[in-house]
Amino acid sequence: MLFIELLKAIFFGVIEGVTEWLPISSTGHLILVQEFIRLHQDKAFMEMFNIVIQLGAIIAVIVIYFERLNPFQPGKSPQQIRLTWQLWLKVAIACIPSIIIAVPLDDWFDVHFNHMLPIAIALIVYGIAFLWIEKRNQTLEPRVVKLSRMSYKTAFFIGCFQVLSIIPGTSRSGATILGAIILGASRTVAADFTFFLAIPTMFGYSGLKALKFFIDGNHLTLSQLLVLLVASLTAFAVSLYVIKLLTDYVKKHDFTVFGRYRIVLGSLLIVYSVFKSLF
């Protein structure tokens, strides 16, 4: 039984590692996959699992961008050190809206929107938004082509877009990338800032979910700990590849394909949801 559970954990880790960085909603995909492939765990663990598994993906960002994000990296010039600290300040400013709005409302949105139909609608709505933005941008040049040129005000408003991802199916990366592009950032800058913003956001969110799990009187069994570790390690390994793939992709392509994918998947989920309610 444990062997089968660990195989499922690997599968969920792959799903997380791929969908965390593509603008197609990792949490939404995990919830949907669990309609068909279930871990034999209680509800409290699964709610925590769906969020804490993201730590593996976040650690991949730190590994890939460690030199760029480390202000104490040997060999950096004074100007590079200053720009690194400024980047971290922008990331911190972008976290403010989530701290003020998303954290207090998280449980309410979990109760009312953590279902297939709201996920499907969110997939479609943001899919349409991606198609519209990319069509609009065909005649526009981005104003922000380097992270060092991004203002603190722009970083804050990108953080406001991140709050939208509190609705399952939205996609944290999708919301921040979409917001950054709307605010004039290039696709490369939008993707990079999304990766960096994920570090404090997801560490904090995962920490809160884990803390809530234990405060509510739950305990991790050895099998649950193994499932969580295996899934997180898999997400880490897959993320190392997907992050590099996405950074290369956005240099030559737009996000239209992801918009179309979201619309198709959301439409199929609505059909499935209706079919399931009838039968």
UniProtKB/Swiss-Prot annotation:
E.C. number: 3.6.1.27
One MF annotation (Gene Ontology) recorded for this entry: undecaprenyl-diphosphatase activity
Keywords carried by this UniProt record: Antibiotic resistance, Cell membrane, Cell shape, Cell wall biogenesis/degradation, Hydrolase, Membrane, Peptidoglycan synthesis, Transmembrane, Transmembrane helix
Coiled coil: none
KW Transmembrane helix (keyword) present: yes
One GO location term (cellular component): plasma membrane
Top enzyme category: hydrolase
A matching Pfam family: BacA
Membrane topology: Multi-pass membrane protein
Subcellular location: Cell membrane
UniProt record, GO biological process: cell wall organization; peptidoglycan biosynthetic process; regulation of cell shape; response to antibiotic
Residue spans crossing the bilayer: 2-22, 44-64, 85-105, 113-133, 163-183, 188-208, 225-245, 255-275
Keyword Protease included in the entry's annotation: no
Source superkingdom: Bacteria
Known catalytic reactions: di-trans,octa-cis-undecaprenyl diphosphate + H2O = di-trans,octa-cis-undecaprenyl phosphate + phosphate + H(+)
PANTHER family noted in UniProt: UNDECAPRENYL-DIPHOSPHATASE (PTHR30622:SF3)
Entry-linked NCBIfam families: PRK00281.1-5
Family annotation (HAMAP family): Undec_diphosphatase
Family: Belongs to the UppP family.
Function recorded in the entry: Catalyzes the dephosphorylation of undecaprenyl diphosphate (UPP). Confers resistance to bacitracin.
Other comments on record: Bacitracin is thought to be involved in the inhibition of peptidoglycan synthesis by sequestering undecaprenyl diphosphate, thereby reducing the pool of lipid carrier available.
Protein name, per record: Undecaprenyl-diphosphatase
Source species of the chain: Streptococcus equi subsp. zooepidemicus (strain MGCS10565)
Upper lineage: Bacteria, Bacillati, Bacillota, Bacilli, Lactobacillales
Gene name per UniProt: uppP
